Amino acid sequence: MIKGVGIDSIEVERVKKIIDKGDLFAKKVLTPNEFAQYQKLEGKRKVEYLGGRFSLKESFSKAMGTGLGKSVGFQDIETLWDDLGHPVMTSTKFDGNIFPSITHDNHEIITFVVLEEK
């Protein structure tokens, strides 16, 4: 049974400005595993990665019906790549199946998350 659906977007230019200020935001939003992947990236891929992970976490929290805050925090949600480069999302706050989707172009990063109860 579907528990929830969440969608979010963020402007690429906004993410670029955040990255230009240093790693403080990335360290707040990304788990240690995500941050390790992030540090290996450069340029456009770095922007897509940070913006995508932030937006996916927003989408997840919307699907949970909580938003980000006391109930669900950035460190409670992790999205890494599988062997084929697909996003695989896990969370300490949800025990069901999580289906993330992400797309981006030169202007916008859009994410979608479906939560399915076991």
Curated annotation (Swiss-Prot):
It is found in: Cytoplasm. Mg(2+) binds at residues 8, 58. Its EC number is 2.7.8.7. Keywords: Cytoplasm, Fatty acid biosynthesis, Fatty acid metabolism, Lipid biosynthesis, Lipid metabolism, Magnesium, Metal-binding, Transferase. Its cofactor is Mg(2+). It catalyses: apo-[ACP] + CoA = holo-[ACP] + adenosine 3',5'-bisphosphate + H(+). GO terms for cellular component: cytoplasm. One of its GO terms (molecular function) is holo-[acyl-carrier-protein] synthase activity. GO terms for biological process: fatty acid biosynthetic process. Its main location: cytoplasm. Transfers the 4'-phosphopantetheine moiety from coenzyme A to a Ser of acyl-carrier-protein. Belongs to the P-Pant transferase superfamily. AcpS family. This is Holo-[acyl-carrier-protein] synthase.
